[in-house]
Amino acid sequence: MTEKEEYRREVLLISLEKDNKRLLEIYRRGEEKDTLSQRAYENVYERVSYALSSSSLMNLEKLPDLEERIIFFFDEDYYDNVPSSSKRDIRYYITAFKRFFLILKREGEIDEERERELYSLLSSYL
């Protein structure tokens, strides 16, 4: 992973960690109206970190692009074998990837067209 990609990954992970702590606090106070499990809040940070880590996902000679990472992460065979995974958790992963795309767009790494294509790919898993 290049230094720039490592930096982007760290920015995402810091953002996810802050959001997850805030959401977990809301959940514990009983203010969350949704029926989502506490486990989903606790696991999304770890899972998205894993999804963005090319070395832990694929044995490829080249660094996989975002589309390859998304397809691999959400692939039915893989997703069904992730410990504690459930289909209702999927919106957390999608939200996390969307945040990552916003970071990339803000940094000028992707344009609006690429962002739309990535969102379209994510929406195919809903």
Where are these regions (language model features)?
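Charge-rich, intrinsically disordered N-terminal extensions
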Residues: M1-L126
